[in-house]
Swiss-Prot record:
Mn(2+) 1 binds at D13, D339, H340. Pathway: Carbohydrate degradation; 2-deoxy-D-ribose 1-phosphate degradation; D-glyceraldehyde 3-phosphate and acetaldehyde from 2-deoxy-alpha-D-ribose 1-phosphate: step 1/2. The gene is deoB. Mn(2+) 2 binds at D298, H303, H351. Its cofactor is Mn(2+). This is Phosphopentomutase. InterPro entries: Alkaline_phosphatase_core_sf, DeoB, Metalloenzyme, Phosphopentomutase_DeoB_cap_sf. It is an enzyme of class 5 (isomerase). Its EC number is 5.4.2.7. Belongs to the phosphopentomutase family. It holds the Pfam family Metalloenzyme. It comes from the Bacteria. Binds 2 manganese ions.
C-alpha cells in the first residue's frame, strides 16, 4: 500500500536556485553560466515576496548566500532541498526527462543562429514554398506572426523559427496554407530532424488566423515530438495501471508516453493551477500521480530577461499555493520544483545551468527539514518507490526521509 495515495508534482519552468557545479561548461551569449542564479538574482535585484513557498522552506535551502528577500523559517511546514542535473543539456525536455529518471548523455540540438540552409532548402523542395529567411531565429511566437504574417499572406512563404528549446516551429495562416498542408510539411520536417547535426525534440505546427495587426493563434497547434529513448517512471506507473495526469505541456514533452489522463495545454500559469485544482477535486482520481508544468516564468519573463515580470509571476503562483493545499487530501503529497534555470538578469536570452529547488509538503507529515542535496531523478525514484514500481535509469529515493 502506498505511503501517499496521490503525489502531485508541479514544475515551475526555469526557476533555478543557483549555478550548478558544471555551469561554466554552458554559456549565454559567450558568458559562462557560472554566475547565474535565477531565484537569487530576482530576490536581490527586485525583491521577492513568496510567503507560502517560504513557509515550506524555500529560504532554508542550502546556498552560498541566503535568498535576500525570502526569509528562513525556524519551523518550516515541509521538506526542502536543491537538486543537481547530471544530463548534458539545459533544455525543457532534458530537465523533465531526467526528473522522470533518464540520463541524457546526447543532448538535443538548439539553433541560436537559426537553422542551417540545408534544412530550409529541403523543406522548400518538399513543400514547393519558400521560407522567410529573416524569421529563421529564436523568436516569440506572437511577435513572429506580427512581423511576418502580412508577408506570408501576400506570398505564401513559410514562417520557420525556433526558441531556446530544441524545436522547429512553422507558423501558417490557415487561409493561406491549409491545415492539412501545414501538418504534412511538419511531418516532413520531423523526418529530417531525428539525428545530428539537427536532433530536435519537437516540430510544432503553429496555425493562426486574422488580419495584419490582429493575428491570433488557433487551437489547431500540433506537436511532432520524439518519445523518451527509455521507459520513464511515467511508463512504469502506466504499465502498473496507476493513474497519471498531465497538466500543461507535459504530454508534449513526453510525446504522450506513460500518460493516461491528459488535462490539456495551459493558457497561462493561473489556468494551469485551475486545471491542477480540478484534478485534485476529481473523485475518480483516488490514487496516482499528477504532473504539472507552468511555463510562463520561462516563456514570458526568463527569455525576455524581465526580472520584474518574473518576480510578479512567482508571487502570483505563490498566492495560489494555499488553494492547492486546501484541495489536497490527507494522504496526498505535493512536490514543487523546476527543470532548469533562466536567470532574467543574466547575459543572453538562453536557459542557465542551475540547481533546481525542491519543496515537499503533505498534510499527513509531522516532520520537516532538509533533505540531502541530490539529483533531478531522485524525484521520480521517490514516486516509484511510493507506488511500488521500478525506478527508471537513475535516481535515489528520499521517501524514507518523509515522516
Amino acid at each position: 500500500m502506498p505511503k501517499f495515495n496521490r503525489i502531485h508534482l508541479v514544475v515551475m519552468d526555469s526557476v533555478g536556485i543557483g549555478a550548478a557545479p558544471d555551469a561554466n561548461n554552458f554559456v549565454n551569449a559567450g558568458v559562462p553560466d557560472g554566475a547565474s542564479d535565477t531565484l537569487g538574482h530576482i530576490s536581490k535585484t527586485v525583491g521577492l515576496n513568496v510567503p507560502n513557498m517560504a513557509k515550506i522552506g524555500l529560504g532554508n535551502i542550502e546556498r552560498p548566500a541566503p535568498l535576500k528577500t525570502v526569509p528562513q523559517e525556524e519551523n518550516p511546514s515541509g521538506y526542502y532541498t536543491k537538486l543537481e542535473e547530471v544530463s548534458l543539456g539545459k533544455d525543457t525536455m532534458t530537465g523533465h526527462w531526467e526528473i522522470m529518471g533518464l540520463n541524457i548523455t546526447e543532448p538535443f540540438d538548439t539553433f541560436w543562429n537559426g537553422f542551417p540552409e540545408e534544412i530550409l532548402t529541403q523543406i522548400e523542395e518538399f513543400s514547393g514554398r519558400k521560407v522567410i529567411r529573416e524569421a529563421n531565429k529564436p523568436y516569440s511566437g506572437t511577435a513572429v506572426i506580427d512581423d511576418f504574417g502580412p508577408r506570408q499572406m501576400e506570398t505564401g512563404e513559410l514562417i520557420i523559427y525556433t526558441s531556446a528549446d530544441p524545436v522547429l516551429q512553422i507558423a501558417a495562416h490557415e487561409e493561406v496554407i491549409p491545415l492539412e498542408e501545414l501538418y504534412r510539411i511538419c511531418e516532413f520536417a520531423r523526418s529530417i530532424t531525428l539525428e545530428r547535426p539537427a536532433l530536435l525534440g519537437r516540430i510544432i505546427a503553429r496555425p493562426y488566423v486574422g488580419e495584419p495587426g490582429n493575428f491570433t493563434r488557433t487551437a489547431n497547434r500540433h506537436d511532432y515530438a520524439v518519445s523518451p529513448f527509455n521507459p520513464t517512471v511515467l511508463d512504469k506507473l502506466n504499465e502498473a495501471g496507476i493513474a497519471t495526469y498531465s497538466v500543461g505541456k507535459i504530454n508534449d514533452i513526453f510525446n504522450g508516453a506513460g500518460i493516461n489522463h491528459d488535462m490539456g495545454h495551459n493558457k497561462s500559469n493561473n489556468h494551469g493551477v485551475d486545471t491542477l485544482v480540478k484534478a485534485l477535486k476529481d473523485d475518480n482520481f483516488k490514487e496516482g500521480f499528477s504532473f504539472t508544468n507552468l511555463v510562463d516564468f520561462d516563456a514570458l519573463y526568463g527569455h525576455r530577461r524581465d526580472p520584474h515580470g518574473y518576480r510578479d509571476c512567482l508571487e502570483e503562483f505563490d498566492a495560489r499555493i494555499p488553494e492547492i493545499i486546501k484541495n489536497m487530501r490527507e494522504d496526498d503529497l505535493l512536490m514543487i520544483t523546476a527543470d532548469h534555470g533562466n536567470d532574467p538578469t543574466y547575459a543572453g536570452t538562453d536557459h542557465t545551468r542551475e540547481y533546481i529547488p525542491l519543496l515537499v509538503f503533505g498534510k499527513s507529515l509531522s516532520g520537516q527539514g532538509h533533505i540531502p542535496v541530490g539529483h533531478f531523478a531522485d524525484i521520480s525514484a521517490t514516486i516509484a518507490e511510493n507506488f511500488g514500481v521500478d525506478k527508471a535509469m537513475i535516481g535515489e529515493s528520499f521517501l524514507d526521509k518523509l515522516v
